[in-house]
Each structure stands twice: as structure tokens, then as C-alpha cells.
Amino acid sequence: MSMTFAINTIKHPSIWEGLVRLPLLLLLLSFSVTLSAQNADKLYKEAKALYDAKDYTLAFPKLKTAAEKGHKKAQYRLGRCYEKGRGVTKDEIAAFQWYGKSAAQDYAKAQYAVGNCYKEGIGTAKDHKKAVEYFTKAAQNDNADAQYQLGKCYLKGKGITADAKKAASWFKKAVNNEKDGKDIIAKIRKKVAEGDEDAKTIMKLAGVKP
């Protein structure tokens, strides 16, 4: 502590008081942030239970409050509400915006959803390059749907240079995904049964038995 600073603190005690109060203010701020996060998580869990029970009207306001507090899962599910018109008037632009907020927090489901919005033109203009960008992020975060879609992008050369080897690699990751691989396999087999020629190619590249 310099002599000048020491003299100033004697002449102006408010300086010293400020220094003493600063750690307390930081502690209170930290506590407030933690409490807000806990409240958001509690709201999300309540909302998810209602959402899963298809009580969208009651789920929506809780999801919105949690989403506004920055809860990434709530932001994603709020996007679903807006996209599908669940508990609120359908609004694809709002859906895209909320998916984007969640995706920015590295939430794989939201990253996939943003990619799908760019692929299908949901709430934004179609942009296959952007779709690939977000599918890649979600695929690298082990999202099976994104791995499957990324494989299709490489297979068809949509938004990226066609590459059969990379397509096969992503299809294999999708069908071997620990969480959702079985669902992807079921999807491929269903499409093959319906006579989808692309699905037959995907089945072969993924190494899935008929």
C-alpha cells in the first residue's frame, strides 16, 4: 500500500469502506446468480413434467420463465413449443431464435434443431452450408440425429463437398450411437421397407443388416 493511498484512506474513509464492502457485494452477486440458476432448473423440471404429460398450456409459461433466465434446456424446449404450436401460437421465427440461444450454450439437441431449421427453412431462409455447420456441431456432441443428417449431407453433397467415405463414417456413428442408435436403425429400416432408394444406400454404408 503506497503512502499516498494510506493518506487518502484516512482523509476519505469511504475509500476503505468501499474496499471492505466489495468482497461482500461479489459474494452476494455470486449467491444471487446461483439462486437464479437453481430457480430456473426447478422451473424447468416442473415444466418438463407438464410437457411430457402433454399439458402444454401449463408448461409453456414455466418454460418461458426458465428460458429467459438462461436455462439452455428450457430454451430448446420453448423453441419446440413455438415450432409446433404447443401451449402458444405457432411462431417459427421465435422457435428459430430460441433454438439459437440454446445452441449458443453448446446444447446438442438445439444445435441439431438449428441445423434442421436451416435445412428446411423453418423461421429462417434455407441455407445448406449453415445446416452442415450446425449438424457438425451437434454430431460432434454425440447427437445421433445430427450424425445421420450429416451423413446424408456428405452423401448428397448438400452444403458440403460429397464424400462417400465421410458419409459412411457418420452413418456408422449414428447407428452405433449408445443413446439413440437403435432409433436410427429403425428409421433406416422403415424407409427401406417403404422403397426409399437412398435408405438402401445408407443401410449399406452404415453396415446395417436388412
Give the residues covered by each predicted segment.
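N-terminal secretory signal peptides that target proteins for export/translocation
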Residues: M1-V20
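Helix-start (N-cap) detector for alpha-helical repeat units in TPR-like alpha-solenoids
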Residues: A40, K72-A74, A108-A110, A144-A146, ...
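Terminal, low-structured helical/coil segments at or just beyond the last alpha-helical repeat
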Residues: A40, N176-P210
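Hydrophobic face of amphipathic alpha-helices that form TPR/SEL1-like repeat modules
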Residues: K42-L50, K62, R77-K84, A113-E120, ...
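Short helix-capping/linker turns of helical repeat alpha-solenoids
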Residues: L50, E68-H71, K84-R86, D91, ...
